[in-house]
Regions:
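Short helix-coil junctions and helix-kink-helix linkers
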Residues: 49-51, 152-156, 285-290
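Short, hydrophobic/amphipathic alpha-helical patches that form generic packing surfaces
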Residues: 25-33, 130-138, 269
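N-terminal low-complexity or simple alpha-helical regulatory segments
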Residues: 1-102
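Extended mid-to-C-terminal alpha-helical interaction segments
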Residues: 196, 200-302
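Structural motif
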Residues: 17-24, 121-128, 258-262
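Short, Lys/Arg-enriched C-terminal cap helix and immediately downstream tail that follows
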Residues: 304-314
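DNA-contacting interfaces and partner/effector-binding or oligomerization modules
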Residues: 57-58, 62-83, 88-211
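Short acidic, hydrophobic short linear motifs in intrinsically disordered regions
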Residues: 42-48, 146-147, 278-280
Length: 317
């Protein structure tokens, strides 16, 4: 079964760029985040791209062919241990590869690998969204929303990570950057930020899925709060009933139940017979029924009589 991350990436692979520059921006991010560039000599390069997601591999190959008409090779390897597939795309040294890398903002002529993001490709919002979409497809993770809400992009290179975090933030979300084992993670924890970014990247269907999960979580949490409140009320009612029965025992020893006023005696008999009921429920056992307030006044009267009996007993001693 595909992971939630793989499902989101599959949806993103079906998003078409709104303009030709969008496709270049997306491909630039895909190659920059999950590609490895090899220098073969002056003006000669080769590129290897690895991914565990078939949809990502298909997107890279399609964009490379459609935009630059470069030759690619694909090797699919299966991990017996992890039961996953690994896709290796190779662009061997060939005419046009260096020019393509320069056009994508990955190479700077005469300087080597570009440190930051390709700003020339990111002048329009749709192109910025496409670049972030490519970065997520290449190095992104999103937790199954049935657990915690968490989305992150794993990248290398401090300048690239810092500029990408700012770019993600420009799409209307609060992105945080954390260094992790020599790499960098740009992450979102807010539900609203995650939904906003998914929509911006083009994964509207999964944004709606997450909203539905949150609604279900909200209902479950509300039910849990009500159940916990009811249990707490029952516990408090049980504690109160224990105190009342202890008071009744004192009344029986100090006064005698038969000597109590009829209404108070009825209260004592009912409480002993129904230790689990609240005062309001206890009142409903009378004929005619009595209110919670009436039962409370009977309890207060019992307390007063017991206090008087205790005082009198102490005076006699």
């Amino acid at each position: 079964m595909a992971s939630f991350t793989a499902e989101v990436k599959d949806e993103l692979s079906r998003v078409e760029g709104r303009c030709p520059t969008c496709e270049r921006a997306q491909l630039s991010a895909l190659l920059r985040v999950c590609g490895t560039l090899s220098f073969k000599g002056t003006g000669r390069y080769a590129l290897r791209i690895t991914t565990e997601t078939g949809a990502v591999a298909r997107t890279i190959i399609k964009l490379v062919h459609d935009i630059f008409d470069l030759n690619t090779s694909l090797t699919i390897r299966r991990s017996v241990l992890h039961k996953t597939r690994n896709y290796l795309i190779e662009l061997a040294e060939q005419d046009g590869l260096e020019e393509a890398l320069v056009e994508l903002g990955i190479l700077v002529p005469g300087q080597g690998l570009a440190a930051g993001i390709p700003r020339a490709l990111l002048q329009k919002r749709c192109c910025r969204e496409a670049f972030v979409r490519g970065a997520f497809m290449a190095g992104g993770f999103i937790a199954d929303p049935r657990g915690d809400f968490h989305l992150e992009l794993a990248v290398t290179g401090e300048d690239f990570a810092n500029e990408l975090a700012v770019l993600v933030g420009s799409l209307g979300v609060h992105a945080r950057l954390n260094r992790r084992r020599g790499a960098y993670a740009i992450y979102l924890k807010s539900f609203d930020d995650i939904v906003t970014l998914l929509v911006a990247m083009g994964a509207a269907r999964y944004a709606h899925t997450i909203e539905g999960v949150r609604a279900i979580k909200s209902v479950k949490n509300d039910v849990n709060r009500r159940v916990n409140a009811e249990l707490a009320n029952q516990n408090r009612a049980g504690d109160a009933a224990d105190v009342q029965r202890s008071l009744i025992d004192d009344a029986e020893q100090l006064i005698g139940l038969s000597a109590l006023p009829r209404a108070v005696r009825e209260f004592c008999e009912l409480r002993r017979a129904n230790p689990e009921l609240s005062l309001a429920e206890l009142g409903q056992e009378l004929t005619p029924p009595a209110s919670k307030s009436a039962m409370y006044h009977r309890l207060l009267r019992l307390q007063s009589l017991v206090d008087e009996a205790r005082a009198a007993s102490g005076a006699e001693k």
